[in-house]
């Protein structure tokens, strides 16, 4: 049995909940996981390679879990990135230790400057490159290795 970070629970998502979250949280950074519509978002949310940690402050999504790697997305209800730095690090440490990950990556729209600075300066992600013509324009790919957290 895998133990979760103490402040989280695994999110449960049915069709109605997925549609509600898609509508309610459209403005949250990273919430839509690079998906173009609610149908695509729903497929990601119920995929066996996705783990969604839910808490009172928001969500942490680990998607594309395979071969010791995953893509991580953070969505905070209050939008206060710096308030959640330690919780974000704890979730990443949990995924690396309990899920056996050695690398997590984040894909962030290039226009989200504050989110990119937070990932790099506070969490420790390293910028790897630009994904051109990603879902809605260019995106930045960042990564964090187990020994860097």
Locate the predicted segments by residue.
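Conserved acetyl-CoA-binding loop-helix of GNAT-fold acetyltransferases
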Residues: 81-97, 117
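Conserved beta-strand-loop-alpha-helix junction that forms the acyl-donor binding cleft
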Residues: 105-117, 133-135
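A conserved beta-strand-loop-helix scaffold within acyl/acetyltransferase catalytic domains
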Residues: 39-49, 58-68, 131
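Conserved acetyl-CoA-binding loop of GNAT-fold acetyltransferases
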Residues: 119-130
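Short amphipathic alpha-helix that is part of the acyltransferase structural core
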Residues: 1-36
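C-terminal "cap" of GNAT-fold acetyltransferases
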Residues: 133-149
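Conserved acetyl-CoA binding element of GNAT-fold acetyltransferases
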Residues: 65-79
């Amino acid at each position: 049995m895998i133990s979760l970070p103490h402040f989280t629970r695994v999110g449960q998502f049915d069709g109605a909940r997925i549609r509600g979250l898609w509508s309610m949280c459209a403005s949250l950074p990273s919430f839509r996981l690079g998906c173009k519509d609610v149908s695509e978002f729903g497929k990601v949310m119920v995929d066996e390679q996705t783990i969604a940690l839910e808490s009172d402050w928001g969500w942490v999504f680990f998607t594309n879990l395979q071969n010791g790697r995953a893509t991580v997305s953070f969505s905070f209800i209050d939008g206060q990135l710096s308030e959640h730095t330690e919780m974000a690090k704890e979730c990443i440490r949990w995924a690396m230790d309990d899920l056996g990950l050695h690398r997590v990556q984040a894909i962030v729209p290039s226009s989200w400057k504050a989110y990119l600075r937070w990932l790099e300066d506070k969490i420790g992600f390293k910028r790897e490159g630009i994904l051109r013509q990603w879902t809605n324009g260019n995106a930045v790919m960042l990564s964090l290795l187990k020994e860097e957290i």
